[in-house]
Amino acid sequence: EKRKQTLIAEGVIAVIAVIVGYAGYLFLTMTVEAPGGPENAGALGSEHSHAGILVKIFGDEFDFSAPAYQIKSPWIHFESRDGTTIHKHATGVELEYLFNSLSIGLDDECYVFPDGKSFCTNDEYSLKYFINDEPVSDIREYEIVEDDKILITFGGETPEQIQEYLSELRNQEIRK
């Protein structure tokens, strides 16, 4: 009887050892990926880049520092109640993923707020994008690199007003 109990105890210990060993193997070989991430993104932590952003709608600055826009994705986000610095934590993460995570629609003609209010290019007003002072037609597929500056405007701005916005953005601190 004692021998039987010893064999059972040894068997239980062996099973526990196998489980612990397997769990240890999985832990040591796992990647830092989380489900639901951006397509073609690298592992979390594969990059840490920062970019400044300024969004002006009819001259009014959009505030990403509100809690509704803070850390909505581990891959790319705003954090620390700062609405002017984008933090990217993996390679292959495009700006479209950031805006989707904030429930903001974005394409080459429209900027759509989470409440559905949209600002679309028409005969009087236009949506414009600038990356590092250069006009671009769309930013969705753009992947930020360290110290980028991104301007999004909607309205009927003069070239002088655009230059003022770009200057404001250039002087804006990127919080790292």
Q: Where are the regions a protein language model picked out?
A:
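Ubiquitin-like/PB1-type beta-grasp interaction modules and other compact soluble beta-rich domains
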Residues: 1-176
